[in-house]
Structures are given as C-alpha cells and as structure tokens.
Amino acid sequence: MHRIVAVPRHATAIRAVADLLSRFRLDFIFVGSVARAAHLGDPVAAGSIDAVATMGPQQKSQLAMMAQNNGFGVDREELDAAEELDLVPITFDGIRVNVLIASNALYGRMVADAESVEFEEIALRVPRAEDFALLLQMNNDVEALMSVVESPRFDRAGYNRKLQAIGLRELVVPE
C-alpha cells in the first residue's frame, strides 16, 4: 500500500471530506482517485473525490446541510436529482465530491473491511485490494485492474469467491 500523495488543492478537499464525514460520525472509505493513489501510487491530481459512507437514507439531507455549513457547495437541484441514486453530490473549492451511501451488503462489507493508509498527518481508509479490484472491474479499467491483481498482496481466491457470490462468475481471475 502506498502513502497517498495529492496536489495541494485536492489534498485540501480530501482533508475536508475526511473531517466532514468524521464529524458526522460515519464509517466511510475513500474510493476513486484516493484509493487508486493508495493501491497504485498515482498522485491525486485531478477529478472528483469519492467516498462510500455507511448511513441511512434519512441522513442524506443532514449530511448535505452539515456540508454546506462547513464550506462545501451544495446544489439543491442536483441533490434532489440524485435522490434515487443514494448519492450526496457536493463540491469543495470547485472540486466535485461524491458521497455514495453504502446501501447494500456489498458496499457495507467493503466499508467494514477497509484498510488504513497514511495521508499527510492523518490515516484514511480505502477498500482492500480485492474490493478495489471489483470497483476497477465495474469501471472497466483493465490496466489498473491487472496491476492490482498481479500484486503479491492480492487474494485471488477471495476475489473469485466474491465475484461468484454476486453473480459475476464470468469475471473470475485464473489462479
């Protein structure tokens, strides 16, 4: 696992998201570019900051209100449009932030099993390699997926069991 490195603007956004979700007392993980930085060593330099948080649907509006009171931008129309998606779309200093609600067992387990990784003076949580590989698979990011799968830390048998359990047997990785 690599120490997370980010350009200053994104580093500020990552810290703000971690602070917001921690203050709201949510279990959460960073996915997307932050997880990519942890697993592959790529710096966070562009794009959105994405997190998955364990919370009830009724907490979405509370999170949006708290975000707005802590320097985040909240577009009410966009928030209303995302109602069915279990997503809280916000911004911080012009950077898009997506907080996905862990509304099913797969995401809930991903949050519960997350690993800790260093970022500046704080510890962030990101999905385990096998869960990150599943996210890469769903994003069709074959190059990054192969890098993760070929890592000595990767549990192919565990990954394959998870794929079979969720009905994706055709994506099993040869052992």
Stretches with model-predicted labels:
Residues 1-175:
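Compositionally biased terminal segments of proteins
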